[in-house]
Amino acid sequence: MRTKWVLLAILSTIVNVLSGCKSLAVLDPKGPQAQTQANVIWLSIAIMAVIVIVVCAILVFVLTKYRDSKLPKDYEPPYIEGNHVVETIIVGVPILIVIFFSVVSVISNNKVEATPEGYKGQDPLVIYASSSDWKWHFSYPENDIETVNYLYIPTNRPLQFKLYSFGPITSFWIPQLGGQKYAMSNMVTTLHLAADESGEMMGRNANFSGKGFAENTFHVEAMSQDKFDEWVKEVKETAKPITEVRFNELLKPGHEGQLTFTGTHLDFSPAPEGENAGHHHGSSDSNTNSSGEHMEHDHKSSNSKEKSAHNHE
């Protein structure tokens, strides 16, 4: 009877623990870069599991073989010092494991830093992703539009993100598309991604940047090229242009909803690259006198799956 209750308690504990589990975004890839990283994670888990099992098996063997017995008290087990086979295993196996993981890391890093596999030769969609306290600004030079705190991307096309910050160092991360990369002031870093399938995802700042860090997230939606083109057309027909005054207001610390503009801030506040490298962003000198009022209205997204309202200015 006691055994029955023990087993029931163990089963109940397992069920309760598993009920709180959900799929990890990094292990649910939606693009080739994320798939490469997920493969490395699973490979690492598998190898570590083998190591743990082998070590536990050796531990059980040693505890069993050299347990207390009826041998004389002055008995000493044979020493293995100087045993070349044992010493080679003890030293060689860890070295081989480190070398293997090093090779895997170099190969995978080269893959995720390059144009995604299967997309070479295609023109990427260049998106400037800049951060401020505590917002994300996405500029689409090719389409001449800009969004705040949400990102629409086409599937089956390479994406080239140009990352920089108007404030403290942040880290741009869309777990289901690839790894994180730092966005810093006075310089631009480049991140190559691609989405193989449509769907909604979550992106965030993965580097602590003050009291608003926890809410420093953005919505991501991947869609077909046709739907993406329709969205761009709708934005150009309904959104108001972004101005330098309005943009400087957005750079002030605080949270905002999802905003949409025509034009980009790159026209009057270019990214810190090329001849503009080292330019100081977010200076108080840039906060010029405000003129006019800015009216906002709800953006009715053409995609029925969009749950949150986008404000067009």
Predicted regions and their residues:
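Non-transmembrane, membrane-proximal soluble domains of secreted or membrane proteins
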Residues: S23-N39, R67-E313
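Short, intrinsically disordered, charge-biased short linear motifs at domain edges
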Residues: V6-L7, H192
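Membrane-embedded alpha-helical segments of integral membrane proteins
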Residues: Q33-K70
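Positively charged n-region of N-terminal signal peptides that target proteins for export
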Residues: M1-W5
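Lipid-exposed faces of alpha-helical membrane segments in multi-pass integral membrane proteins
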Residues: I14, I47-V60, I89, V93-F100
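C-terminal motif of bacterial Sec signal peptides marking the signal peptidase cleavage site
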Residues: V17-G20
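Sec-dependent N-terminal signal peptides
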Residues: L7-T13
